[in-house]
Amino acid sequence: MSSKWTLEACFSYVFAVLMFIGMHYFQHNQGGSGLELPFNLVVWCFTSLLIGLGLLKVSHSQRLRYNRSLLVMLFSTILLWLPLLYPNAEFGEFAIDRLLGLSAGILIIFSIMQLELSRQHWHHILYFILAGVLIESIYALVQLYLLTQGNWVGFNVNATRAAGIFQQPNVLGTFVLFGLLASAWLISEKAVRSKLQQIIVFGCCFFAAWAAIVSGSRTVLIALFALLPLLFPYLKNSAEPHLLRGWLICIALGCLAPALPELLNDGVARDAIGGETTAYRVTMLKVSWELFKQQPFMGWGYGAYDGIYHNAQAAFNAQGLIKGYHFNVAHPHNEIAYWAVEGGLLPLLTLLFLAGYFIYSIFKQTWTKACFHLGLLFPCLLHTMTELPFYHSAIVWLLFCFFVSKIATEAEGLCTKPFPAKFAPKVFAGLIPLFTILFMLTGLQTIHHISTFERTGSSDVSLLEGIINPLPMLSRYEFDAMTFRLNAASKLHLSDELKNYLSWSDSLMRRKTRTENYYNRIQAFKALGLTKQAEQTYQQALFIYPDTERVSFRYIFAMRTGEKALQAYLIWNKQQLKDKPDAALYIHQINGLVLLGRIDEALRVQQQASQRLPNELKLRNIPSLKPYTEPMGSS
């Protein structure tokens, strides 16, 4: 085979196309995580090709390359699948996607180890990572500073934080840190020689640091300033001094760069590090800890976190035991807590064992090299303790697996064993990319149809009927289809169909507690004339989504029911505020007034709220009022 078309070279080419083009794919969507986000589906298409090349290498060489770290990861992955067999895994099917993603990560690590990637191949891969980071960093800055209202990508120009393609600013921040990590790895291996390479490395460091700051993520800021002391001791000994100085200077300039647009913007600062997320995270961890204590051995069952969390949180809130009420929680923003609550002790001990072994393996090297390797993984590891980056972004998971594979290889080396089976790896090398690409491309069609359906009034059912593969968005597809049938049954007074909806939603409510699910059940009960059950469901929804929190079911129900209901809600809201001022109630009132077109009144309420609650900064920055309070010509 020509040296230009070896499997290792093809691996580099596929990865290059992914970083230059594939990962930046844009398609309108309704948000979410995992396969609900179009760019993730495209990343998995390329990932399947990379896995296929690794399996093809096994077939050609008839050898297996592995080390103890790979075996530990494989064993741990098998253990993490076992809770699916627990008797409480009623909703286990909804955990299969994350287990498949985990298994695919182990498979990509295995595939990388099979390929005989030279130092030059690895350096090319690192430069391709820099290219991807540079593209996303510049795109994020364009979003924040240059896009105007009504832009074709749908970016909210009133947002104070950039998100890049990821639709989630914190994920952007973690991704761009890979640019700093890859550049550090390159200068540590003296792989930055030409002027062009220096421009790429230093330019990426500057723009990546800038994008990291404007992502507004506290987690990213902590990771940024923690990774520098972890990387520096090894870089001091291995990197050329002038490159190390340039690397540090460009990072520092990138961190300072966000201040310049503010100075040129008449002192109007963007509140990038705003929000009250700390209290919410503390609440999620506290509730998760209590849930774990109640079911420590077998957990509550894979796929059950969403439903059990909201009921437990509401109970603690009623007792005044928590501060920082959260909503729509499908994940506790801490990976260890997530697996522990759903699966109990086995996943918890497995993850701790896996982390402990990997740290032990890398610290068998010199302490400077070990700290360097730990620093390369630290941003992602930290982010998994505060959010769910691997669910939001497949490319972050893929790059993390790349780094794990390379670090494990450097720390332990590789063993080689004969593997005479030639046909099976070759078959899987073809089947995995084939089925993955077909699945993901039909998934993109699903996202397009569901997004169009929901954005055009949820009335054209032919869009749902035209979906080829609903699996990437199965929950949303089923909800949209059943809601359409509910609305039709309500209009046509089809009692059997209404009862079918209630029967279907019984299971849904145990698994996924959402305001729209409560709303639909209330409508079904009312259509059947079951007013008592409708009222009970309404009261239960108020318990889960109280009036004085960011998401109030009373407000949402009034907003969806119609103008008269919303006006009645505003009267009730004002009466409550006379007795006791509350920021959330003020915000709901202002949003309701904006929906009714009473803008002047909404502005007066905002002014009154700011006077009564001067310490509530969120009252000064209400998104629904921004179009009416922004200075003319501001972006």
Where are the language model's segments positioned?
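Interfacial juxtamembrane loops and adjacent helix segments
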Residues: 148-161, 275-279, 290-294, 302-342
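Alpha-helical transmembrane segments of multi-pass inner-membrane proteins
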Residues: 9-23, 42-55, 77, 81-86, ...
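Transmembrane alpha-helices of multi-pass inner-membrane enzymes
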Residues: 45-48, 228, 369-423
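Membrane-interface catalytic loops of GT-C/OST-like multi-pass glycosylation enzymes that act
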Residues: 32-36, 92-97, 166-169, 215-219, ...
